[in-house]
């Protein structure tokens, strides 16, 4: 009986050149999100996320107040008008948080995956390439230590925004 051939320590994918275009690799996507002016807000700290959200709320607040004045019952009740306009203004920051959360969640899924989906020339030729072990380890480290804290900050911010909306809506009903 012949002896079995020794199996190499490295998977075949590690010995082959990477067919995934550089711009479609998960780590490159991480670098792009990290350098983007919009997606970098939650990356550094919670304050780095809160300041632009408050600014966006303050920018949209006059518009929501103007729209709220279109309601006859609110026009005659100033405190209720202010609260309704403020609550309506929270929709924009909440949508911004949702967009950021979707982008970072997609990145985390790609980093945690054992294979990379990519397209060489267009939408019709989707390919899958198994990540080498070294890539998987590096991607897992980035997903765990860089992306996970960002997602936690975004979830906290969304919870705070939703709570503010609920409190504001309750206050508006109480007035």
Language-model-detected regions and their locations in the chain:
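Long, low-complexity intrinsically disordered regions enriched in Ser/Thr, Asp/Glu, Pro/Gly
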Residues: 1-9
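Cytosolic-side membrane-entry/anchor segment at the start of a transmembrane helix
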Residues: 17-71
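Helix-rich interaction surfaces within compact, conserved domain-sized segments
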Residues: 38-49, 128-129, 134-174
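Hydrophobic H-region at the start of alpha-helical membrane spans
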Residues: 54-59, 84-88, 155-164
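Juxtamembrane "helix exit" motif at the C-terminal ends of alpha-helical transmembrane segments
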Residues: 58-78, 165-175
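Hydrophobic alpha-helical membrane-embedded segments
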Residues: 81-110
């Amino acid at each position: 009986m012949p002896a079995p051939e020794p199996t190499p320590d490295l998977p075949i994918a590690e010995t082959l050149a990477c067919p995934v275009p550089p711009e479609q690799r998960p780590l490159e996507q991480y670098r792009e999100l990290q350098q983007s002016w919009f997606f970098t807000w939650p990356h550094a700290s919670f304050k780095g996320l809160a300041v632009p959200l408050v600014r966006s709320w303050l920018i949209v607040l006059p518009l929501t107040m103007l729209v709220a004045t279109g309601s006859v019952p609110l026009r005659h009740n100033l405190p209720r008008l202010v609260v309704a306009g403020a609550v309506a203004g929270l929709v924009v920051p909440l949508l911004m948080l949702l967009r950021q959360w979707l982008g970072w969640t997609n990145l985390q899924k790609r980093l945690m995956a054992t294979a990379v989906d990519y397209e060489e020339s267009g939408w019709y030729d989707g390919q899958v390439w198994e990540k080498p072990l070294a890539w998987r380890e590096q991607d897992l480290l980035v997903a765990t230590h860089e992306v996970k804290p960002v997602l936690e900050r975004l979830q906290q911010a969304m919870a705070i925004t939703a709570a503010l909306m609920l409190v504001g809506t309750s206050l508006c009903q109480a007035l």
